[in-house]
Swiss-Prot record:
GO molecular function: ATP binding; ATP hydrolysis activity
Lineage of source species: Eukaryota, Viridiplantae, Streptophyta, Mesostigmatophyceae, Mesostigmatales
Gene name of the encoded protein: minD
Role of this protein: ATPase required for the correct placement of the division site.
Localization in the cell: Plastid, Chloroplast
Protein name: Putative septum site-determining protein MinD
């Protein structure tokens, strides 16, 4: 199995590869959508990118990329010696420097270990990828532990909701405990109209509460549904919406380019105080 994974890659330099886990703790915040759009945007900037769908048995990243009919082999077959890693890495036809690796097929479950993930990522690094983005399973159980094991950096995705913020705070602590200190925040599904009515926390409020450097903010967009059904990330639309522009902006910031953050309005300090009280357990009369 080790020989299958490392075939033809032993002498290549992998020191320049950045391995980033995209995580959230809470499901339904747009983590997989974020992975697809950041990955595609980074590839369009000229970098070689590998995306790993680490959600065992519940993969969706292939659907968002329009690659579901091309997934013949997965990491499971690689580990079992049925194929080599290069056969399981599916190259995107639109941007050949973007590849997808699924851990398992939809109805399969594989007992993945931390060692499996580390070996897998090490082998991808040997193929001279500039970026490896790992789409982490929702939750903080063994799937989370395995997905973050090979990562050196993390992007925490949250929404401006108290439950999502609290989960993001817990995930940030777990990442630090795992030795991942390069963590950035992406606030998704922002509603400027609700912020103006003081019904939603602003992006700045969320960032200040979590104390994590802000990578970007993505507005709520009904085009996400259309994008998912078409298997085409928002950033590939001919006419970019604000959410598509925001994803591209975040991708440029992630690769180190100096880009201004997309401003999605300001918030209300009274609402911020109420949520802070809730998160700290002192929500009397809230």
């Amino acid at each position: 199995m080790i020989e299958q994974i490392n075939k033809d890659g032993e002498k290549k330099n992998s020191t320049d590869t950045r391995t980033i886990v995209i995580t959230s703790g809470k499901g339904g915040v747009g983590k997989t959508t974020t992975t697809a759009n950041l990955g595609m945007s980074i590839a369009r900037l000229g970098y070689k990118v590998a995306l790993i769908d680490a959600d065992v048995g519940l993969r969706n990243l292939d659907l968002l990329l329009g690659l579901e009919n091309r997934v013949i082999y997965t990491a499971m077959e690689v580990f079992e010696g049925e194929c080599c890693l290069d056969q399981a890495l599916i190259r995107d036809k639109r941007w050949s420097n973007l590849a997808l690796l699924a851990i398992s097929k939809t109805r399969q479950r594989y007992h993945l270990t931390r060692r499996n993930m580390e070996m897998l990522v090490d082998s991808i690094r040997l193929r001279n990828y500039n970026f490896i983005l790992i789409d982490c399973p929702a939750g903080i159980d063994v799937g989370f532990v395995n997905a973050v094991a090979p990562a050196e950096e993390a992007v925490v995705v949250t929404t401006p909701e108290i439950t999502s913020i609290r989960d993001a705070d817990r995930v940030a602590g777990l990442l630090e405990a795992s030795g991942i200190y390069e963590v950035k925040l992406l606030v998704n599904r922002v509603r400027p109209d609700m912020i103006q009515k003081n019904d939603m926390l602003s992006v700045r409020d969320v960032q200040e509460m979590l104390g994590i450097p802000l990578l970007g903010a993505i507005p709520e967009d009904t085009n996400v549904i259309v994008s998912t059904n078409r298997g085409q990330p928002l950033v590939l639309n001919k006419k970019l919406t604000l959410s598509g522009i925001s994803f591209e902006n975040a991708a440029r910031r992630l690769v180190g380019r100096k880009e201004y953050l997309v401003n999605l309005e300001t918030g209300n300090k009274g609402l911020l105080k109420r949520v802070q009280q809730f998160l700290t357990g002192s929500e009397e009369n809230v």
